[in-house]
């Protein structure tokens, strides 16, 4: 038997979208992801499928690398609406931070991410469609999460890198470097 993906019909896309939503509700993001890929194979610019695919990837975040962040970001950035691009970028950042909280990442490492998510939500709020308060709801969730974390200060690194800096391994390979002795 030949293993070859089958292409769904464009007429079947609305039902396939419903199945994606169902599998997300059932907490089966891999199933939802597979269907999103099938929809996009039939209609590569389908905005709902792009949104849902990005969301199914964020549903799989566990707070460790690799978490498919860049892949989800690519799908969200391909949305045509400026509002959607800002809103879903904020949601992407927020969901990654929440996954990292659950994975035990120190709170001070997440403050910057949550502030960046809030910046996205604030910009999205300015251009939101009428009667759409989603960006404000997400902003409020970030505020509550920061309050729960105690709003720790962002840890500042005193290390600065410059264009001419060399990786430590390269220094060790140079004559007179530690490895050369």
Predicted regions: what they are:
Residues 42, 78-79, 127:
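Structural marker of alpha-solenoid helical repeat scaffolds
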Residues 1-14, 77, 108:
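TPR-adjacent "capping" and linker segments in tetratricopeptide-repeat scaffold/adaptor proteins
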């Amino acid at each position: 038997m030949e293993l070859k993906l089958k292409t769904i019909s464009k007429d079947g896309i609305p039902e396939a979208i419903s199945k994606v939503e169902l599998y997300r509700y059932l907490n089966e993001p891999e199933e939802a992801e597979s269907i999103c890929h099938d929809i996009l194979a039939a209609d590569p610019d389908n905005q709902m499928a792009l949104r849902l695919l990005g969301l199914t990837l964020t549903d799989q975040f566990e707070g460790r690398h690799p978490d498919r962040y860049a892949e989800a970001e690519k799908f969200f950035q391909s949305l045509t609406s400026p509002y959607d691009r800002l809103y879903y970028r904020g949601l992407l950042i927020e969901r990654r931070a929440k996954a990292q909280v659950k994975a035990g990442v120190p709170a001070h490492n997440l403050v910057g991410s949550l502030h960046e998510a809030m910046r996205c939500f604030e910009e999205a709020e300015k251009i939101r469609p009428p009667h759409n308060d989603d960006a404000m709801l997400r902003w409020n969730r970030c505020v509550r999460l920061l309050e729960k974390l105690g709003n720790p200060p962002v840890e500042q690194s005193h290390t600065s890198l410059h264009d001419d800096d060399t990786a430590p391994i390269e220094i060790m390979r140079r004559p007179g470097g530690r490895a050369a002795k």
